[in-house]
Amino acid sequence: MASRNRALFSVSTLFLCFIVCISEQSNNQSSPVFACDVTGNPSLAGLRFCNAGLSIKARVTDLVGRLTLEEKIGFLTSKAIGVSRLGIPSYKWWSEALHGVSNVGGGSRFTGQVPGATSFPQVILTAASFNVSLFQAIGKVVSTEARAMYNVGSAGLTFWSPNVNIFRDPRWGRGQETPGEDPTLSSKYAVAYVKGLQETDGGDPNRLKVAACCKHYTAYDIDNWRNVNRLTFNAVVNQQDLADTFQPPFKSCVVDGHVASVMCSYNQVNGKPTCADPDLLSGVIRGQWQLNGYIVSDCDSVDVLFRKQHYAKTPEEAVAKSLLAGLDLNCDHFNGQHAMGAVKAGLVNETAIDKAISNNFATLMRLGFFDGDPKKQLYGGLGPKDVCTADNQELARDGARQGIVLLKNSAGSLPLSPSAIKTLAVIGPNANATETMIGNYHGVPCKYTTPLQGLAETVSSTYQLGCNVACVDADIGSAVDLAASADAVVLVVGADQSIEREGHDRVDLYLPGKQQELVTRVAMAARGPVVLVIMSGGGFDITFAKNDKKITSIMWVGYPGEAGGLAIADVIFGRHNPSGNLPMTWYPQSYVEKVPMSNMNMRPDKSKGYPGRSYRFYTGETVYAFADALTYTKFDHQLIKAPRLVSLSLDENHPCRSSECQSLDAIGPHCENAVEGGSDFEVHLNVKNTGDRAGSHTVFLFTTSPQVHGSPIKQLLGFEKIRLGKSEEAVVRFNVNVCKDLSVVDETGKRKIALGHHLLHVGSLKHSLNISV
């Protein structure tokens, strides 16, 4: 039956607020876990590893030298056992902070003192904002709340987030955790979020606020699809795709974000488990990229490469292979159980173990774990009062608003006018959703505001479920009756974790069960505007709704976090002008019917009827394209500055001086001697808001290169989000590096500068640029 709902908060919200108030009045706080408590044990003051005035290297060397082999092995696992004789407590490495402090992993938990933490939108929606400042701001709040929880013994300091895998296939259950399908967006998200988590207020590179971890390295984007399982999947990836699609976010994490950790994945890449591949770990992460931190396995990965993948004949051999490849920390206990046996069998020596635990200890020292009482350190004043603050919760609301994508708006049907809507029908399986809004890898939110509650704060709203998300059985008749009696309808449908999640990929792109029938029949009966809200991580084939004239507006809201209902209402009623853009392609169902999820190739193969993947390589039909979006205003672009010609100066003996070349290596003296002070040039654009209301707008700079080396159809060079008032204009500047930004990856995985005609794209503008020698 339909029911009136003007609830401002749920009962659980009121209870949570009550608990917070009580806990603030309590002086019985738990203590954080830390080493070198010289106040409690003055004898520790003479230990060099407890001397914060020494270099981290000197302290680590001293500590490792004091440990027995058995004690060393205890620090190879995520539940480090500690050494009481040296004043080192046990420590749980595994905490998560994908979009807020989580209680997944055991390293962090919620208690009476801190019963919840701010739950921001799931990453895919935050990425849709294309706002680098927002990415970093969220990371900073999450790390502040984490430190506050650590100070009362409720959290660790090492967080295995973010997930920067490429959202390669629309069926992937974990696509919701990622920044989307584009390497440039994913890289910028990775760097900004990592900096938000890690950077200290003092800016000391040898100190960490918390330690972030970029995962899952590498080419991991399938969980469980038609009996293809991540634990046994061998990702066959050519060097070209590895270099220009799968690796860039991880490289950016390490090189530009200075992340403290990288997690290797379950899958194999070209026949080798990533956690036992010395080329990927020691060669690339620590060698080429110079990781300052530790490499951790996904949980049980070393056990998996032995028991599931049969890459090692014995557990001891599996441990040895992982340590010798460059793995420092094993999530779970496998390496702790079998490392001693590996040493005794001569498969690995103690030096390899010393190297691994040294990286782990160095990270903890940068966090201040070995500096004594954290309450006397930089963030020692943080506590429960700094978690779930009004500002933090407002940022969660604003983050959701900035990410929401308006996909259809017939005849300007949105925003709705509150004064014109006397009765609003709110219908659908996600219309009164709570936990669904916060996706996965979440904690306990400060509070929930459901879509129904958010809308009901503005206009009189009547609710009808229609069906649950699976929508096997539906009460469509009651929903139709309600729609027919209301001035406007908001339908909130889509997915939840039963449809898409870790360990569960989708098999099709249809709305679940009878949801399409529910939407179509409700829209047919409605006598006013019909707003379709899709709550999901991945895209759906909603061609039926796109073409249905009775459905006047469509919005995608991802999983919008604890304040999702408020953000949705802000957009629907015009308090916020939508400015999000899709971070991934929405494909038709026909696409997944002919493309196996297990095919890792990004580029099309016409001879096999393979269409390729992502906007960079796929030219077929889409439901909605990457970066698609509408807004309540209009923005015009005018190109002010960009070169027509870039000349590269080659050495006298360079072979391309005497013969015609299609491309050059993207390294060498010619990369320093191009026009405009090196290999850089600037693109300036004037952007004007020509509409009748203020709004934010993302300016995208794309490029199309000459078709050599299977180069992308187009690729994103950069983006900038700006806010303009009515009739306001501003200049947006992009700095373009020829060798970095205009290069493509060849078939061997090397970067090349394509010579000849390039196109720069901004909106409908196209600018020709020629690169010559």
UniProtKB/Swiss-Prot annotation:
> SMART domains, from UniProt?
Fn3_like
| Keyword presence, Hydrolase | yes
**Swiss-Prot/TrEMBL catalytic activity:** Hydrolysis of terminal non-reducing alpha-L-arabinofuranoside residues in alpha-L-arabinosides
- pH dependence, entry free text: Optimum pH is 4.7.
Active site location: 298
Null phenotype? Reduced seeds size and delayed germination.
Q: Which residues are glycosylated?
A: 131, 349, 432, 770
- SUPFAM superfamilies recorded: (Trans)glycosidases, Beta-D-glucan exohydrolase, C-terminal domain
Question: Family, per the entry?
Answer: Belongs to the glycosyl hydrolase 3 family.
Q: What job does the chain carry out? A: Involved in the hydrolysis of arabinan. Can hydrolyze (1,3)-alpha-, (1,2)-alpha-linked side group residues and non-reducing terminal L-arabinofuranose residues of debranched (1,5)-alpha-L-arabinan backbone. Also acts as a beta-D-xylosidase, releasing D-xylose from arabinoxylan and xylan.
Name of the featured protein: Beta-D-xylosidase 3
Originating species: Arabidopsis thaliana
Organismal lineage? Eukaryota, Viridiplantae, Streptophyta, Embryophyta, Tracheophyta
